[in-house]
Design a protein with these regions (language model features):
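Conserved acidic residues
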Residues: 34, 57, 78, 158
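N-terminal Rossmann-like dinucleotide-binding module
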Residues: 1-54
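Predominantly a Rossmann-like dinucleotide-binding segment in NAD(P)-dependent oxidoreductases
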Residues: 136-228, 282
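Beta-strand-loop-alpha-helix segment that lines the small-molecule cofactor/substrate pocket
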Residues: 79, 85-138, 152
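A structured beta-alpha segment of the ubiquitous adenosine-cofactor-binding alpha/beta core
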Residues: 58-77
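Redox-cofactor binding/interface segments in oxidoreductases and associated redox assembly factors
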Residues: 38, 81-82, 105, 162
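C-terminal glycine/acidic-rich active-site capping loop/insertion
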Residues: 135, 208, 235, 240, ...
């Protein structure tokens, strides 16, 4: 089967998300990276793309060049991934959708409701795929939790509590660090800082696992470091359309927490807990029964969890990267 042609905007050298997309897109031999505009510095972006194997005539200096260069090619890319700063997502996604490209965009897709509605309309009219990368929902044991909820194994959901909090931006001197500073600058990040960066993952996880949508909410945003225009901490209370009560905390100044993304779902007949720092395990407690640890790869999992378990039981999902380290 011929590989799909893939292009990337953003995710340049030194970024965290760029290598994750490049490894992920090409892990199963389904995609080949054939075009890219990888950096806001045109020459750096072109040079890095060529080092990654992109032909010189498809290593672009910016997204506008990439759109102009790809739209009329007979071998144009099949999918464009947008991994640029938040405030640029809407403009880039809209332009590529209107030109007839499929788009996978990093979160958040837009910073305004009307922009989101416009993207939905354009995607529907174009007939093209337009998706947002909520990557944590693809962990096997997250899929197991969702399947258990859907199957009624913990009864009607009463309460969901989720948080995504870390302390890696807790140093006020980070005001001078460009890799941190942009996240709290409205010109680059849009109208939200920490919530758009991490809290949105927690909100999506609540909707995804509970198989329900947020209907109403109230929120308290705070900038605990005075130099920051946008929030570095937020608390959100919400209600879902099915009646579930929700609680969410997200913070980048919670010193001592490393990658504190977890979710707890409490139903009428049981509870579930999953944490990204222990992604191979799902904690299940039936009402009146003993707490159980459900392991990735064990027998009896729901089909979606089995399908996405890429390595055998007791191995971390990062096992192939340990092998990759031997070659580097």
């Amino acid at each position: 089967m011929a590989k799909l042609k893939w292009g990337m905007i953003g995710g340049g050298e030194g970024s965290q998300i760029g290598p994750a997309h490049r490894l992920g897109a090409q892990a199963d031999g389904l995609f080949e990276m054939t075009a890219g505009a990888l950096d806001h510095r045109p020459e750096a972006g072109r040079e890095y793309a060529q080092r990654l194997g992109v032909a010189a005539d498809r290593a672009y200096g910016n997204w506008q060049e990439m759109l102009a260069g790809e739209k009329d090619r007979p071998d144009r890319v099949d999918l464009v991934t947008v991994a640029t700063p938040n405030a640029t997502h809407f403009e880039i996604t809209k332009a590529f959708l209107q030109a007839g490209f499929n788009v996978l965009c990093e979160k958040p897709m837009t910073m305004q409701v009307d922009e989101g509605e416009e993207i939905v309309r354009i995607a529907a009219e174009s007939g093209k795929i337009c998706a947002v990368n909520y990557c944590y929902s693809a962990y096997p044991m997250v899929r197991q939790a969702r399947a258990m909820v859907r199957a009624g194994e913990i009864g009607k959901i009463r309460l969901v509590v989720t948080n995504f909090s870390h302390g890696h931006h807790g140093d006020a001197t980070d005001a001078d660090n460009p890799r941190v500073r942009w996240r709290y600058d409205p010109a680059m990040a849009g109208v939200s800082g920490q919530f758009a960066d991490c809290g949105i993952h927690a909100m999506h996880m609540a909707s995804f696992v509970c198989d329900d949508e947020v209907e109403t909410l109230s929120a308290d945003f705070a900038s605990t470091i005075p130099s920051r225009v946008l929030e570095d901490d937020a608390m959100v209370n919400f209600r879902m359309s099915g009646g579930t009560v929700g609680r969410l905390w997200t913070s980048s100044v919670a010193i001592g927490r490393q990658h504190g993304f977890d979710i707890q779902i409490f139903g009428e007949t049981g509870g579930l807990r999953w944490a990204s720092e222990q992604p191979n395990q799902l904690i299940y407690t039936p009402v009146g029964g003993r707490t159980q640890i459900i392991e990735k790869g064990e027998s009896g999992l729901h089909e979606d969890a089995r399908r996405l378990s890429r390595v055998s039981i007791a191995h971390p999902e990062g096992f192939p990267l340990a092998v990759a380290n031997i070659y580097c």
